[in-house]
Amino acid sequence: LPDVPPVYGITRPVQTWNPIKINFQHLWLLIQDAYRTNSWKDKFRIWFMPTGWRPADVIERYPVYKIDDPYHFQKYAPEASVALRTWTWIQFLFTFALINYFFINIANIGTPNIFVYGGFLFLCVFAYTELMDKNPYAWAWEALKNAIGLFLIYQNGWFGMSETMPWGTVALASYFVLSSIVVALFARSLTFYS
């Protein structure tokens, strides 16, 4: 139909910026539906049915919000101040720099440490997207991320960074401290969220 504009997206909006939560929300719904349905047949076949299929008895008892009209719906766009948006971009760029360092030095970092580094990157993304969602516990995720980052630096430097960039470890440690302070300020002041 040439006169109907295409609409791209999903019919069950996730209402978060957090990609880790997004990946597990659908799995969690499948697990809950498999547990909640009374039909043993549905408990098994839910894992093999097309995307979006739910057992009939579960749909009635546990409805899930679904977009019925793709041309008129509320998009997920939480209000954020200029300060919060600016800090989010700084967090993103810093995480992007850490990812680039990881890929450039993956051979030097070594097998057990690449998993530590990868897990830390997941925590970085989780922490700043929780702040974007204005989760009241975003400060705790940020504090955990920064504490682990400082611990890793204290243990052995930042995965060989001091060999190529002598100032890099100090800059990274400073970022972790500054990040904790800034996110604590966001968490304490509601004016940052308006």
Ranges and model annotations:
Residues 1-88, 126, 132, 137, ...:
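Cytosolic/stromal cytosol-facing helical appendages immediately following the last transmembrane segment
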Residues 75-163, 167-193:
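Substrate-recognition/cap regions that form aromatic- and gly/pro-loop-enriched pockets
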